[in-house]
């Protein structure tokens, strides 16, 4: 390992910091819609009354509100599937810069929806910011992974998830009645997204383009070398360049990789399966059910001030993402993901017991709070941050954009399904709804144990070569890598 490989330079932190402002936008827009639900529904009612001279029917109101929440995920699906169209043509940094136009348009639509007496403006704004966030969930992990040195790739990749959870926490705090979650200021609450967009537009021109993109996609070796020297803080970047050139040579031997090719080619089939299942393990773990309906869950658990308990879970969320940031390069991705899944399954069982016995034993409300906080904490240890950046690690430069698009689409689709279905399933199953998530978590644990490789400390080309060859040479492996390094199938 080069001495500079663990060096954190100012230019590297500027690049990563500028990029993860997009992650913060994703988190903010995920969490912002929940707190002001009642005042926005009242706005819908007033608008309907203004147009038609009568109160809005309750079924129409429910439909409009569900659309306002769910349209964000629909936009995210479209955006995530379009990642490859932008990053290969315009580059990673320029794609992030261009997409801020969507954030500005969305801010204007949502900010002026009350003035324009138009709930259509709000819904369209939610759709557009959803497209922006879908693109961001592809751009940011890809860019951060490509500018980071191998030894710091996991830690810096976790900053994407940290940006998301900080965004959720800011949305929860800003959404309090006493701040912006009231009848007068909710348009500002939804449109404040123009601030991080503006800040990103100021910072990104000073950030370098991905050196991998410059060398492998554009064949601009001198520019790539110059960028690497600034990012690494050293004049000797020979090893980085050699690794990228080897990846480039491998890419030239491969034909252009389409999304269909990812599923057809034996070399890509296993990594794309891993990428998709890890994304599903994040969204189908039940975490979004907890965040979407945390206030109502705390109310059922008998908490007097549920909104503050929800903010408490947001603080736990942020704190344990920071913990993951410091341990991901020591413990490894696979290990943390397994710990997170197992811990969440245990907390889901506790939550079920607490909610089921709440009427007979009022003190169970305290157990439910502990279970929810534990559920959130274990999520941020592994299933929260790791699926985002491990997708970029599993693929070389050629198939990476297509793989990120497929994985992102899987994430957003499962997010949409949970958001739409949880309320109905919860009404059907009552306190036993989290048993469903427990079963899913156990299945994801089994899959991760047998199929997911450890990517810690390995270059992109080494990881991709492992899948191509069905396993690296035994002499190159650490004891940890010897144990299911590329899944059971690869060890035949």
From Swiss-Prot:
Q: Which GO terms describe its biological process?
A: cellular hyperosmotic response; cellular response to glucose starvation; cellular response to mechanical stimulus; central nervous system development; cerebral cortex development; D-glucose import; D-glucose import across plasma membrane; D-glucose transmembrane transport
Positions modified as Phosphoserine? 226, 465, 490
Disulphide bonds annotated for this chain are none
Topological domain (Cytoplasmic) residues are 1-11, 88-90, 145-155, 207-271, 329-334, 389-401, 451-492
Q: Which Gene Ontology CC terms are recorded?
A: apical plasma membrane; basolateral plasma membrane; caveola; cell-cell junction; cortical actin cytoskeleton; cytoplasm; cytosol; female germ cell nucleus
The alphabetized UniProt keywords are:
Acetylation, Cell membrane, Glycoprotein, Membrane, Phosphoprotein, Sugar transport, Transmembrane, Transmembrane helix, Transport
Instruction: Give membrane topology per the record.
Output: Multi-pass membrane protein
Fill in the PTM field for this protein.
Answer: Phosphorylation at Ser-226 by PKC promotes glucose uptake by increasing cell membrane localization.
Which Gene3D superfamilies is this protein grouped with? MFS general substrate transporter like domains
Reactions it catalyzes: D-glucose(out) = D-glucose(in)
Tissue expression notes? Detected in osteoblastic cells (at protein level). Detected in brain, and at lower levels in kidney, heart and lung.
Which residues does the annotation say bind D-glucose?
161, 282-283, 288, 317, 380, 388
Q: Which residues lie on this side of the membrane: Extracellular?
A: 34-66, 113-120, 177-185, 294-306, 356-365, 423-429
Quote one Gene Ontology molecular function term: D-glucose transmembrane transporter activity
Segments carrying the region annotation (Disordered) are 468-492
The UniProt note on how this protein's activity is regulated states: The uptake of glucose is inhibited by cytochalasin B. Glucose uptake is increased in response to phorbol ester 12-O-tetradecanoylphorbol-13-acetate (TPA) treatment: TPA-induced glucose uptake requires phosphorylation at Ser-226.
**Which InterPro entries would you find in this protein's record?**
Glu_transpt_1, GLUT, MFS_dom, MFS_sugar_transport-like, MFS_trans_sf, Sugar/inositol_transpt, Sugar_transporter_CS
Family indicated by similarity: Belongs to the major facilitator superfamily. Sugar transporter (TC 2.A.1.1) family. Glucose transporter subfamily.
User: What is known about what this protein does?
Assistant: Facilitative glucose transporter, which is responsible for constitutive or basal glucose uptake. Has a very broad substrate specificity; can transport a wide range of aldoses including both pentoses and hexoses. Most important energy carrier of the brain: present at the blood-brain barrier and assures the energy-independent, facilitative transport of glucose into the brain. In association with BSG and NXNL1, promotes retinal cone survival by increasing glucose uptake into photoreceptors. Required for mesendoderm differentiation.
Q: What is this protein called?
A: Solute carrier family 2, facilitated glucose transporter member 1
The scientific name of the source species is Rattus norvegicus (Rat)
Q: What gene is it encoded by?
A: Slc2a1
